[in-house]
Every structure is written in structure tokens, then in C-alpha cells.
Amino acid sequence: MEELLREGKSVRQLVRESIDIARTAFELSLLAFVSGDESLCRAVLSAERQVRERELLVYVRNSLAVRSLDDAMMSVSIFQLEKNLSRITDAAADIAMSYLNFKPPLPRYQIVDGEEVIVKLPYKAGHGARLGRLLSETGVIVNVVALKREEKWILEPPLDTVLRDGDTVVAKGSIYAVERFAERIGARVPEPPRGGIVGEFFEIARIVSVMFFLSLSALLMNADWLAENVVELEGVMDEFHAKLENRIISSDLSATAKAALLSSTFALERISDSLNEIVTPVLEDLEPHPILMEIFEETKERISVIEIDEEDAGKTIEELGYHLKGVTVLAVKRGEEWLVMPPISAFRLEPGDVLIVKYFEESESFVEREETREDREEIIEEIWEEEEED
């Protein structure tokens, strides 16, 4: 806390860092649990304190900056976001502790499967290669979430990191992009968990992952309909959670495996509840704080918009090739209609469609070519105005 105070970081910087830490902690907690990696579990635990410290500082700095009732009302979105990012990180730590406490005798996997895959890969391409160079040589974009060297984990390693044989990297991206990256570093993408109770556990983890970025998108766009989708998914999550809970209890798994899975499932439920709370200001018609637009353009995984022009009209999302460049389409705004997670191989785009996209920091130059930052900000402001009129 004292170090953060000395650094004098702004609310914008603190919230941005909290988003990155919470997302990374959530994703790595799942990978740590399913792979049985104790050192990765401990890395997740360290994130809990980091976000809690930032939460307290956000309250202090934002309270000092409030000068009017309007300022206070806009600050609600910041407070709700930061409070629930802290809760999400706490729940991620509980998933890590579920493994550390119970050491469940479950099948081990080195991959978490979803809209994107998160996978542990051994580096075998020789000493001296820089991470950024390796990524550029593959022609695709993945996010290297973490790097393990000996017993130390480095979260979000910089692109100038020099890799060594024996390192372990955690990569995230589309399955095609991750396979290309794995091939370049002399590794192979393992099979993900399929079916069974562990497979069902990761089905609900996928729902939570979708909710994470939809809740941030709803906040950025001030979009009721996106917020309502988060609420609906939270209801789906409740149903899945109850069914999985019964399946775990009635299974023939060992007592420690049951305890670990139940504890982790409860943690996912808490994350789902927190994501639901993040969109509360939107549903209550409270104006979002203007710094949110800047925050979501600066995180490691960013959220913004791209408008479809005549050149790309008629193409499917898959034909745009975004999945190769680390870009995921979360939703499409077509006129007054919102479509969440449309099928990438079947949904055909029309001129004027606005894509709500999530992309890696490394994809910024690609997204900038598709839509300049200035144009993206104008599109978001127009959506804000439309949502306020509705």
C-alpha cells in the first residue's frame, strides 16, 4: 500500500491495473486448479492483495475528487467496478486455495478451453529469442499471460523478455493462433477436458468468462440490453451451478475431489454475482464515468468498437480473420438491435454494423487500421447518446 501511495497513481491507472490483475487471476486460477500447479496457485494468491490495495486507494482518490452531486453519481460506476474486481480476485484466490487445501486426485490438464484457449506450453526453441520477435514471426497474435522460470511466475511478461529453454509460458488466444505459436516454440497444444464432472465445471467457467467481458462492455457502452444479458447469464449460471453441485455430491469421486470441486464451483458462483453487480449502474440509469472509455482502451485485454463498411459487408466474422489477430467479437449492434456472441462462421455482416470487440494489447495496431481511436471514441459516444434517449 505504501509503495502505491508513493507512486501517486491516478484512479484511471489503479482501475486499469485492477481489471488486468482480476482477469489474469481468474484465468490462471482455473489453469492452476486443473493442472495441479502449486506455484501457479501461489501466484494467484498474491494477486488478491494487489487488487484489495488498489480498491482502497480508488475510494480515497475518487472521494477527494468529487465536487458535486453529478460527480458522485458518475463515480458509482467506478466504485461498483473496483469493489467487484476485488471480489472476483478473492474468489479466484479461493479456487487456487481449493487445490492447495485438498490436492484433489483429479485428471490433470494443461489447458482451459473456451471461446479462447489458455494453455501451459514448455518452451523448447533455444536460448536468446525475444517474446515479441517470436510472436511477430508466427503471423498471429496471442497473449502471453504468464511465464514461469524455475519456480518463479512472471505475470504479463513484457515483449522484450528473452526466453530460455525450460521456461513455461501460458498463452491465450484462438485455438488456431495458439497452435501456431506452440509450433514455433517447439511445443504442442494438449487436449482439453471433455465431458464428465471436470468438463461440466469448465462449462460454467466459460459462462463466467463471457460474463466478464460482457459486463465491462455494458459499462463502456452504457447499454441496458448488454447489461440485461449479463443478468440473464447469471440466472443460467445459477441453474448450472445447482445441477453441477448435485452431480458432484452424488458422484463416486473421493471426498477431497468433491470438496475441491464444490469449493471452486461456489467461487465461480461468487464471480458471477460480482459481474452481475458491475452492470447495476447501467440498469439503474446512472451515467457511467467518462474515464471508463480511456480505461478500457488501455488494459492488457481491451474493449472497443469497429464499424463495418461496404468493403467488409457480406462477410462472416470468421472471414474477417479477427481470430488470427487476437480480436474477439463480443456483440454486434445493428440499428436498434443488439446481438451477443453471434456465430462467427454463419453470421453475415451489414454496412453500419458496430462490432463490440475484445482484443489483446498486441492487437492495437491491427484494430487501429480497422478503426482509428478517434473514430472509435465517436462511435461509443453516439451509442451513449442513443442509450440515454431510450
Predicted regions and their residues:
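Cytosolic, long alpha-helical scaffolding segments
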Residues: 1-390
